[in-house]
Amino acid sequence: MKVFILACLVALALAREKDAFTVSSETGSISSEESVEHINEKLQKVKLMGQVQSEDVLQNKFHSGIQSEPQAIPYAQTISCSPIPQNIQPIAQPPVVPTVGPIISPELESFLKAKATVLPKHKQMPFLNSETVLRLFNSQIPSLDLANLHLPQSPAQLQAQIVQAFPQTPAVVSSQPQLSHPQSKSQYLVQQLAPLFQQGMPVQDLLQYLDLLLNPTLQFLATQQLHSTSV
């Protein structure tokens, strides 16, 4: 529509220019040249205006076509998800087997109980030095003359005197079968420590005496320390 209106305007302008051209041609040749140049300028302006209008029309058509096309929205479709039924049974899991520790024999358990009663857990084992060993053996050997300790004696003689001075329990013959090693050892420790409990021996000395009974190497070291102090 706009192009048609522009074409009509151009036609009217040309008609007017032609009328003016005919009038001016009658007036003179000089004015005719100026009118021709003026007409050419107007024609160029009209052509430029027509081009601008045509470009505007094309742009409007292009934008209207873009807006009319539906825009594609990604993931516009709804995702169907079926609900989980309530009657599904849980997956069967393997039964958990409790871990079983090492099997402890009743003889070893009785020995550990006897040791736990003699050795309290909250007390730390004292360090065995020469003075403690001397005091321990002096309290257990009343028949040993301390004045004669300066005399040189062999380790075997000194150990024999110490063993004789300790209280010995008589061997009881029974018709029962022979006990296993852990049970016989625990009974031996209880028999050795029972008289010391009755005599009111200090707990520290009892613990050191128990170490001497459990570790024969400590007995040999104790005899060596006694021999060195006597020399």
Swiss-Prot record:
Which UniProt keywords are listed? Milk protein, Phosphoprotein, Secreted, Signal
The molecular function terms of the Gene Ontology recorded here are: cysteine-type endopeptidase inhibitor activity
UniProt signal peptide = 1-15
> Where are residues bearing Phosphothreonine located in the sequence?
T27
Q: Which Pfam families match?
A: Casein
Output the Gene Ontology cellular-component terms: extracellular region; extracellular space
Q: What does this protein do?
A: Important role in determination of the surface properties of the casein micelles.
Protein name per Swiss-Prot or TrEMBL:
Beta-casein
Q: Which organism is it from?
A: Rattus norvegicus (Rat)
Which lineage do the record's taxonomy fields give for this organism? Eukaryota, Metazoa, Chordata, Craniata, Vertebrata
